[in-house]
């Protein structure tokens, strides 16, 4: 029970961070890219790239998760997202820029969808709906705070690279949370095996 409680808190943190990122980018990406020197019409196309990346992240991530470890796929997604967001602060060729935005979309939107799959595996059927519902409820706070924090960041008129570095922080925290979940669950499985022996 103690292990389940700690893992639940870590899941809440992961979903919270994922939704901070989903809604911060979904609401403010065009403005961030305008601040980075791109015109508005191009910046709106970036939003399309973000959502296409999210769709591909969910599909490809799901495919990989069925063949490999889901936690490792999630950590790879969120880590890639953090790197992609930091790279956005540099003057990149347009193709690489679109790719980085798509990766950020895969990490935020795709990562959040895969987190639900991970939670579904963790909770037994009699408490699954409660576990997922509570995690998504906590995550909603992230969905509210994400756009507010991003708007506040932009109002500070900081150098644009600071904004993208700040946006990469939720990805890094999500990597740490998912890693801790994976390690705790692995330790529990080993302890159960030891008792069975």
Outline where the language-model segments fall.
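Interfacial helix-cap and linker-helix signal at transmembrane-aqueous boundaries
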Residues: 33-34, 64-65, 150-158
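Loop-to-transmembrane helix entry/capping segments in MFS-fold secondary transporters
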Residues: 40-41, 125-135
């Amino acid at each position: 029970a103690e292990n389940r409680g700690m893992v639940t808190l870590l899941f809440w943190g992961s979903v919270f961070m994922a939704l901070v990122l989903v809604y911060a980018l979904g609401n403010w990406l065009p403005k961030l890219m305008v601040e980075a020197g791109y015109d508005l019409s191009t910046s709106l196309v970036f939003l399309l790239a973000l959502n296409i990346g999210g769709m591909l992240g969910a599909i490809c991530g799901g495919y990989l998760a069925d063949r490999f470890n889901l936690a490792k796929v999630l950590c790879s997604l969120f880590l890639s997202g953090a790197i992609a967001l930091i790279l956005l602060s540099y003057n990149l060729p347009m193709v690489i820029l679109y790719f980085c935005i798509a990766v950020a979309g895969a990490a935020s939107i795709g990562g959040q969808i895969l987190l639900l799959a991970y939670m579904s595996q963790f909770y037994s059927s009699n408490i699954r709906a409660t576990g997922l519902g509570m995690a998504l409820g906590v995550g909603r706070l992230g969905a509210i705070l994400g756009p507010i924090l991003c708007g506040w960041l932009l109002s500070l008129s900081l150098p644009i690279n600071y904004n993208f570095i700040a946006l990469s922080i939720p990805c890094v925290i999500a990597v740490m949370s998912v890693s801790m979940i994976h390690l705790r669950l692995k330790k529990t499985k080993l302890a159960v095996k030891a008792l069975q022996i």
